[in-house]
Design a protein with these regions (language model features):
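Beta-strand-rich interaction surfaces with strong enrichment in secreted/lumenal proteins
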Residues: 82-84, 137, 160-163
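Polar/acidic, low-complexity leader/linker segments enriched in S/T/G and N/D
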Residues: 1-56
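Oligomerization/assembly interface segments of phage tail-like spikes and tubes
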Residues: 83-106, 166-181
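Short acidic, glycine/tyrosine-flanked loop/strand segments centered on an H-E-D-like triad
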Residues: 64-72, 98-103, 146-159
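Short helix-loop boundary/capping segments
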Residues: 102-151
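Mixed-charge, glycine-accented linear interaction segment located at domain edges/termini
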Residues: 146-204
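A glycine-rich, hydrophobic loop/mini-helix early in the fold
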Residues: 43-93
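A general secondary-structure signal for short beta-strands and their flanking turns/coil
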Residues: 13-15, 89-93, 128-130, 143, ...
Length: 204
């Protein structure tokens, strides 16, 4: 089948609004369930497959993806120069910032535990929480939606709360993106780590 390359106006979006949903590790989103996701949805799905909205995220610091490694090396043979290109191992992360300073955020990002009476306590030694993440964004001008699914992510806080007098207090976390056992392999037989849902996937 030919690649679906061409001019597709519905694929052009701005990330005006967005939300991050979390579920147990290796949870996959079916095509039927995908259509239920909106940025305002508190939960999507039921039981072990339920996705929970992490709430208000920063509008100043949107989720930021980063790759480390992946440098190219060109190898030659005695017979031919520049015979083959190989790439170093690549690792991916996403950093996101909540502005919702409730106990749920601290229990999710900081592994906090309830104290007697009031408050939560957390260690400065990071312990990752293994979850599936779905980062959803929406263009309010077109009502188009798109999203990235990270089924196998290790989440931990990346900083202590960032205070501000002219913006919301932010609570930052970073997820290390790992290979998934539930996503399909790519056409080269490699394990995959990320799934992308295009605007057309939300309407079909």
């Amino acid at each position: 089948m030919a690649d679906e390359i061409g001019i597709h106006d519905d694929g052009v979006l701005t990330a005006v609004r967005g939300a991050i949903f979390m579920a147990k590790a290796e949870t996959i989103i079916t095509s039927a369930l995908l259509k239920q996701f909106t940025v305002e949805a508190a939960t999507v799905g039921v039981g072990d497959d339920m996705w929970t909205n992490l709430g208000h995220m920063s509008n100043d610091n949107l989720p930021e993806f980063a790759l480390d490694g992946g440098d190219a090396t060109t190898l030659s043979t005695w017979l031919k120069a520049a015979f083959r290109t190989q790439y170093a191992q690549t690792t991916g992360t996403v950093t996101f910032n909540s502005v919702q300073g409730d106990k749920g955020t601290f229990k999710t990002f900081y592994n906090a535990v309830d104290m007697t009476g009031a408050g939560v306590a957390f260690s400065l030694e990071k312990t990752p929480v293994n979850k599936s993440l779905f980062i959803l964004w929406s263009d309010t001008n077109t009502t188009g939606r798109a999203g990235l699914l990270l089924p196998n992510s290790d989440i931990a806080f990346s900083s202590l709360p960032a205070l501000s007098t002219d913006s919301f207090v932010e609570f930052s976390a970073q997820a290390n993106i790992k290979t998934s056992s539930t996503l399909p392999h790519d056409k080269n037989g490699k394990f995959t780590s990320v799934a992308y849902f295009a605007p057309s996937d939300f309407t079909v």
